[in-house]
Amino acid sequence: MIFSRIITVFCLLFFFVTIIYPQQKTDLYPVTEPDIYPSLMWAAVQLIPSPEWVTSTDGLKFGIRWQVTPLLYSFGINKKLSPWRYLIAEPFVRQSGSIELFFSPEYLNIKDKFKDMWLFRGGARVYIPLWQRGEYMSASLSASYYNFNGINGISYEGGIYLFAGILGFQTTYSPSFTNSEWIFTIRLRYF
């Protein structure tokens, strides 16, 4: 008798959670595509660099890094939304699980002349949500190809991101970047 009541309560609860509740939730919150576009304010925020430190034979040297994401595919957002983003990727779209192509110019204070201090990097990065679908914490792995004054090579990178990806800590390893194999970056990113 008690067993049949438990089964009945369980079936009613299952019916409510799987059929009635999701329909109510969907009706209250319709899914819409984001209405964001590049603007002057967005461009100004993109000019804020992220600080980084480069290992060298003289110790740590200071540098700064920017990043442009021309293409991103997100696999962690609502399936009713387009997973593709161009130039602008909302923090949740990126941190909830995505793959991006990126271009990253960097200023490294390891040469004597200003024109010789620029490193250009292009690559692919995957983001993996770790906590609260990536809003609280996520991680990334990437591989990139760089050019520094005619010296080319491959880099590998790992990162941890907090606060929907606004604050991140990245470590980049470039085996062929002689005497400066490691770069540590505090990444500041807004969109």
Name the predicted role of every residue range.
Residues G63-Y145:
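Gram-negative (and chloroplast) outer-membrane scaffold detector with strong preference
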Residues W42-S50, G153-F191:
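Predominantly the C-terminal beta-signal and adjacent terminal strand-loop region
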Residues E52-I64, Y107-R121, S144-S155, T172-I183:
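Solvent-exposed loop/turn segments connecting transmembrane beta-strands
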Residues S4-I7, Y127, G158, R189:
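Residue-level detector of intrinsically disordered/flexible regions characterized by low predicted structural confidence
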Residues P22-Y86, F191:
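Short glycine/proline- and aromatic-enriched beta-strand/turn motifs that initiate or cap beta-hairpins
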Residues M1-Y37:
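Cleavable N-terminal export/targeting peptides
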Residues W42-V45, I99-F102, G134-S140, N149, ...:
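Flexible, solvent-exposed coil segments and beta strand-coil junctions
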Residues T57, Q132, I160-A164:
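A generic beta-sheet turn/junction motif
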